[in-house]
Amino acid sequence: HQPRRQRQMCIRDRRNAVEINNAFAINYMEITDIKKQSSKYQITAINKLNGNKFTFFANNIIAATGVHALPGDYSVKSSGIKFSGGAHLILKDDPLKINGNGILLPKTEDNRIMFVLPWFGNTIVGTTDTETFSGTLDRPRANNEDKEYIIRHIKKYFNVDNVEYTSSWSGIRALIDNKLTSTKNVSRGHFFNNVDERFIQISGGKLTGFRLIAKESLELLFSDNFELT
């Protein structure tokens, strides 16, 4: 389960776009094809709730598809990304006695960091960083290896013999594929790929930087010299 506050922030930001800036937001609508038609883009989409299909046109496209490739003819133009799985555990109440404080575990066995955070009366511990993951891109899940990794570090740093968790979840990071290093060393920064005229794709980045990414996307898309190298 994704933390509630992240969901609330995403919903609030979308509502602000609709109510304040007259945006039009659609959930559960999958874009299945994009084709260039003269100076516009023809977009085919399907409503995932009822199966209805739609066709509409756009002058400009900003694609922030995360781990998913662009559809149709543009799939081969998607920037290379590397998947990284990140699992978390939720512990009931405050078994580690952090007393409402966030704690950073400075060094894991694979030279990363982990965190322990209070969350709605419970405790979150995470996260892993692995190039393999269980489940699907749409529904990833924490596997036994992920859980054992987190529990092993809890026992080490908090000197406890038993760790019980109430739930777990996993997410997939879409990182820039540099072909050279493991996911733990890949930058969490974002960059823009010039897919076509007035069509850019965002790769990498983190949720915490979404406002900056949106600002830079619009500045780039509507600049007089729209070119990326």
Say what each PLM segment does.
Residues 27-41:
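A conserved short coil-to-beta-strand element within the FAD-binding core of flavoproteins
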Residues 49-60:
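Core beta-strand elements of the Rossmann-like FAD/NAD(P) dinucleotide-binding domain
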Residues 12, 17, 69, 73, ...:
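C-terminal catalytic lobe of FAD-dependent flavoproteins
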Residues 1-11:
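Single conserved hydrophobic/aromatic residue that forms the stacking wall/gate
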